[in-house]
Regions:
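Acidic donor-binding segment of Leloir-type glycosyltransferases
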Residues: 1-6
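The conserved acidic donor/metal-binding loop of glycosyltransferases
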Residues: 32-36
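Short aromatic/hydrophobic "clamp" motif used to bind/position activated sugar donors
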Residues: 28
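Flexible acidic/His/Gly-enriched loops in nucleotide-sugar-dependent glycosyltransferase catalytic domains
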Residues: 38-106
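Conserved nucleotide-sugar donor-binding catalytic segment
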Residues: 79-153
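Glycine-rich, basic loop-to-helix element that forms the pyrophosphate-binding segment
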Residues: 7-23
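Membrane-interface aromatic/basic loop that binds lipid-linked glycans or pyrophosphate carriers
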Residues: 53, 196-244
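Catalytic core of nucleotide-sugar-dependent glycosyltransferases
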Residues: 137-142, 149-175, 188, 196-218
Length: 244
């Protein structure tokens, strides 16, 4: 049965939460309105759930209007540990979830990176992820309003995003989630978000907020940075940011 819920609030986090709160089935999956899925999308992902897992994630095509490249290459289907999940895109889509994971969890609303705001907590709550190396989803990056297309200061929200993550981090979760959170911070902040930070008072205030949120919370940060395949100058910048 399909039930259409209409909201005047154009926010992905809010729309996802409305869906969560109005579903009654045992499983959930999210599909963005401008993306499309393969005919066997649910069938393939549900096959992972049937193996006893609470999250099953599949491969997807990153469609930019010219090239159709798979998000993951050289991977095999199978169980992915909490720590090993750092290679998976922290997105809602391309997945089927056991609804029980959302019993006490909701996405960050009115913010970019709302997917990231819950991903490590969901993985830790599930205990692991079952990955299927089949293309099940097509992620459309041509939308002019997509986070992948818009390049402005709306990206300066990682303080809120990681604040939401830490607010949902409970003592009963496997400690490996801390390493996943650190890896996700390095990926999201240093490989993407940092380039949007303006070199003015607004930018400095944002960097200060981010530092306050993650201060002494990123387990293994220095070790991960030291082992990154990036120039020495970049490593020093990353270490200086977290140390100061």
């Amino acid at each position: 049965r399909i039930r259409v819920l209409v909201t005047e609030i154009g926010d992905l986090g809010r729309a996802s939460n409305i869906g969560i709160e109005n579903t009654t089935g045992p499983y959930l999956s999210f599909i963005d309105v401008d993306d499309w899925v393969e005919p066997d999308y649910i069938e393939k992902l549900y096959s992972g759930i049937q193996k006893g897992y609470k999250i099953c994630k599949g491969n997807c095509i990153m469609y930019d209007g010219v090239k159709n490249l798979p998000a993951y290459q050289g991977r095999s289907s199978g169980e992915i540990s909490i720590r090993g999940a750092s290679f998976l895109l922290p997105c809602r889509h391309s997945s089927v979830y056991d609804r029980s994971l959302f019993e006490k969890l909701r996405y960050l609303e009115f913010s970019y990176y709302e997917d990231l705001s819950l991903w490590p907590i969901l993985v830790a709550t599930a205990g692991c992820v079952y990955y299927i190396n089949d293309i099940v989803y097509n992620y459309n990056q041509t939308n002019e309003t997509s986070i992948m297309t818009v390049r402005n200061e709306k990206h300066l929200v990682l303080d809120k995003v990681f604040g939401h993550i830490f607010a949902n981090l409970t003592p009963d979760l496997d400690k490996e989630v801390n390493l996943l959170i650190t890896a996700l911070f390095i990926q999201s902040f240093w490989t993407s978000n940092y380039q949007y930070v303006p070199k003015d008072e607004v930018g400095q205030a944002y960097l200060k907020r981010v530092k306050q949120v993650v201060d002494n919370r990123l387990v293994g940060y220095y070790y991960i940075v030291e082992n990154l395949p990036v120039p020495k100058e970049m490593k020093e910048r990353m270490i200086r940011f977290y140390r100061n």
